UniProtKB/Swiss-Prot annotation:
Binds 1 Mg(2+) ion per subunit. It is found in: Secreted. One of its GO terms (molecular function) is metal ion binding. This is Dermonecrotic toxin LamSicTox-alphaIV1iii. It catalyses: an N-(acyl)-sphingosylphosphocholine = an N-(acyl)-sphingosyl-1,3-cyclic phosphate + choline; an N-(acyl)-sphingosylphosphoethanolamine = an N-(acyl)-sphingosyl-1,3-cyclic phosphate + ethanolamine; a 1-acyl-sn-glycero-3-phosphocholine = a 1-acyl-sn-glycero-2,3-cyclic phosphate + choline; a 1-acyl-sn-glycero-3-phosphoethanolamine = a 1-acyl-sn-glycero-2,3-cyclic phosphate + ethanolamine. Keywords: Cytolysis, Dermonecrotic toxin, Disulfide bond, Hemolysis, Lipid degradation, Lipid metabolism, Lyase, Magnesium, Metal-binding, Secreted, Toxin. Belongs to the arthropod phospholipase D family. Class II subfamily. Gene3D superfamilies: Phosphatidylinositol (PI) phosphodiesterase. Its EC number is 4.6.1.-. It comes from Loxosceles amazonica. Disulfide bonds join C45-C51, C47-C192. One of its GO terms (cellular component) is extracellular region. Mg(2+) binds at E25, D27, D85. It is an enzyme of class 4 (lyase).
Length: 275
């Protein structure tokens, strides 16, 4: 999965897919009532990027729905996965549940079209703070109570704060998520800085073990050719990047073209892949 980083305006969906992304990451900010408000990152946001692109969440979700609904004039077949990077910093442990409930209701209305012919992309809820695990509980409960529990088949989970893996596993369990139940594990840092692959290797080892909790592992945010090669050699499932074309180029190199391929809609992002 080539994951386009910080896609916060609707026009950027086409921009990143045209560069080779089959997945995008979108930042979501919340108002004082725990309601998702904008697709917006703000500063700091990484090197060589403009941090202030934004849409109202409702508008972005409708644009995203069109881009992932077969038959729509804006449909992009390649776009199969969306990571919502949830900026929950202004939420408390007590309001996180409400935030998750309200966000699920928003997705149901504006992205899934009330459960009728909505967008088809898989969704990952990515939360930076393991103390906000109740966001996941609220999200799941809202879909169940609305009679759309079936949509949880399209939803995965990630804690992105580079916490201890056992602590993440515990937070997932508190949220009601079982081991390997659509769990993506991220590791990374802003593209301005270097980061070792130590925790990536630990997560990959967990993913590949008989008693791990991780379904897929992705690394963010990289674009240097050497770093991309190192990440692929570490056997990650996804790479988040500002330059999807760089990842495409590396995948076409002799060392990788027979080892990796781009994921398609037929590839289940929740299934453990073993060579």
């Amino acid at each position: 999965w080539i994951m386009g980083h910080m896609v916060n305006e609707i026009y950027q969906i086409d921009e990143f897919v045209d560069l080779g992304a089959n997945s995008i990451e979108t930042d979501i900010t919340f108002d004082d009532d725990a309601m998702a408000e904008y697709s917006y990152h703000g500063v700091p946001c990484g090197c060589m990027r403009w941090c202030h692109k934004w849409e109202y969440v409702n508008d972005f979700l409708e644009g995203l729905r069109r881009a992932t609904t077969p038959g729509d004039s804006k449909y992009r077949k390649q776009l199969i996965l969306v990571v919502f990077d949830l900026k929950t910093g202004d939420l408390s442990s007590s309001t996180a549940y409400k935030g998750g409930k309200l966000f699920a209701e928003k997705l149901l209305r504006y992205y899934w079209n009330g459960g009728s012919n909505g967008g088809r992309a898989y969704i990952i809820i990515s939360i930076p703070d393991i103390d906000h695990y109740a966001f996941i509980s609220g999200f799941r409960d809202a879909l169940k109570k609305s009679g759309h529990e079936d949509l949880l088949a399209k939803v995965g989970y990630d804690f992105s704060g580079n916490d201890d893996l056992n602590s993440i596993r515990s937070a997932l369990h508190k949220a009601g998520v079982k081991d390997r139940e659509h769990v993506w594990q991220s590791d990374g840092i802003t593209n301005c800085l270097l980061r070792s692959l130590d925790r990536v290797n630990e997560a990959v080892k967990n993913r590949d073990s008989s008693n791990g909790y991780i379904s897929k592992m992705y690394y963010w945010t990289i674009e240097k050719y050497a770093t991309v090669r190192d990440a692929l050699n570490a056997e990650v499932d996804g790479i988040m990047t500002n330059y999807p074309d760089v990842i495409v180029n590396v995948l076409n190199e002799d060392s990788f073209k027979n080892r990796f391929r781009m994921a398609t809609f037929d590839d289940n992002p929740w299934e453990l892949f073993k060579r």
